[in-house]
């Protein structure tokens, strides 16, 4: 069966334990889908859900009344809003910076509570003359989508919990 397949691939029980119990992936074209309207409520529930929200537009409408971005906040502010809920791991980063944040991503996946990963995938080629990877890097350098992580379990104060990773001039 399935267990034999995992064994054939050399995947151990310890390897499987590293995967999240619940993984929700929301691609850029589904950010405004009605089923995502309760994302913040789900994150604040304490369930061990890991949520990856990708966005490709930093300038979208933020109003719930417009039917855009069902989370109720602009994509560039989603991670900041989630930090305000407390009690979870939050990581925001452009796709161009994800390899540099692999240790933080691992911590977020390993945490026992909820985690939000908000990733700017870059602007589509039709919106920019740059490949999406380069527009994502430019968004970080310009501070339009800075990289940071917030780990509520990392300590008793903001200095221990919050980190600006790899941003130019983080002060």
Residue ranges and their predicted role:
Residues 64-70, 89-95, 134, 155-166:
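Noncatalytic linker/hinge segments flanking ATPase motor cores
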Residues 1-65, 76, 80, 89-103:
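Thiamine diphosphate
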Residues 107-171:
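Glycine/aspartate-rich loop-and-adjacent alpha/beta segment that forms the canonical ThDP
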Residues 6, 19, 69-71, 89, ...:
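Phenylalanine-focused residue identity feature
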Residues 2-3, 11, 62-80, 132-151:
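Acidic, Ser/Thr-rich peripheral helices and adjacent loops at domain boundaries
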């Amino acid at each position: 069966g399935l267990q034999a397949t995992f064994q054939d691939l050399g995947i151990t029980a310890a390897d499987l334990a590293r995967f999240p119990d619940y993984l929700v992936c929301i691609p850029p074209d589904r950010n405004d889908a009605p089923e995502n309207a309760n994302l913040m409520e789900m994150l604040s529930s304490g369930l061990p859900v890991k949520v990856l929200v990708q966005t490709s537009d930093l300038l979208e409408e933020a109003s719930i009344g417009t039917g855009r971005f069902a989370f109720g906040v602009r994509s560039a502010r989603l991670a900041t809003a989630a930090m305000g809920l407390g009690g979870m791991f939050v990581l925001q980063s452009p796709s161009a910076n994800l390899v540099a944040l692999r240790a933080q991503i691992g911590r977020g996946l390993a945490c026992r509570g909820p985690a939000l990963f908000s990733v700017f995938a870059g602007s589509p080629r039709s919106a920019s003359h740059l490949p999406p990877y380069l527009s994502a890097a430019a968004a970080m350098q310009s501070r339009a989508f800075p990289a940071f992580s917030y780990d509520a379990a990392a300590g008793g104060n903001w200095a221990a919990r919050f980190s600006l990773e790899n941003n130019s001039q983080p002060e």
